A protein has these predicted regions:
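ER/Golgi luminal nucleotide-sugar-dependent glycosyltransferases, focusing on the catalytic module
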Residues: 1-181
């Protein structure tokens, strides 16, 4: 999967720091060496398999240099859940359909933030020219009601009220974001 990610990362032609969170015990030493070979100054952070799409990012964020301006948050998205807890799509449509859907979703998200050098430059210029721009992703969604119960549990932790459910969000947890947001 890292080969696919690097095909998109190659569209980043400006200097950047690469932080990679990997589930501890899930990846081989060969996998880790492949990442190190791609970018020798990579910072690899081993994390627990906890927090779904965002847990590894939150753990890795603690390692990010505070002088960082922008973060590009990526992850390998499959949309199939775990063997002991398959996604709703796997339960409804089966593994093959779910894997196809996951691939399509992943590539759509990646193209939204890294499709080519021109798109990357447009995104970076947007951040540079619009100080109110805090986040850029593939598409905005407003279907928070699907996860309403989980969101309501988290709202007090972040000082948010229930009106937060009516807001839009960047889907797929693949996005550019200002470090200080």
């Amino acid at each position: 999967m890292f080969d696919i990610v690097t095909s998109y990362l190659n569209n980043l032609t400006r200097p950047y720091k690469l932080y990679v969170s990997l589930v501890d015990g899930f990846y081989t030493q060969e996998d880790i060496e492949k990442i190190k070979k791609y970018k020798t100054d990579v910072k690899i952070i081993l994390v627990e398999n906890k927090g779904v799409d965002i847990g590894g990012f939150l753990r890795a964020f603690k390692e990010v240099d505070s002088n960082t301006d922008l973060i590009l948050k990526l992850h390998t998205k499959k949309g199939i859940g775990l063997p002991e807890n398959p996604s709703a799509l796997v339960r409804r449509r089966g593994m093959e359909v779910s894997l196809g859907h996951g691939r399509q979703w992943f590539h759509g998200l990646m193209k939204g933030v890294l499709s080519d050098e021109a798109r990357v430059n447009r995104i970076l210029e947007k951040f540079q020219n619009d100080k109110n721009c805090g986040m850029v992703g593939y598409k905005l969604y407003n279907n928070s009601k699907i996860n309403q119960n989980e969101i309501l549990k988290l709202c007090p932790l972040f000082g948010l009220n229930e009106t937060f459910l009516d807001k839009t969000f960047v889907g797929g947890t693949i996005f550019w974001v200002r470090y200080n947001i």
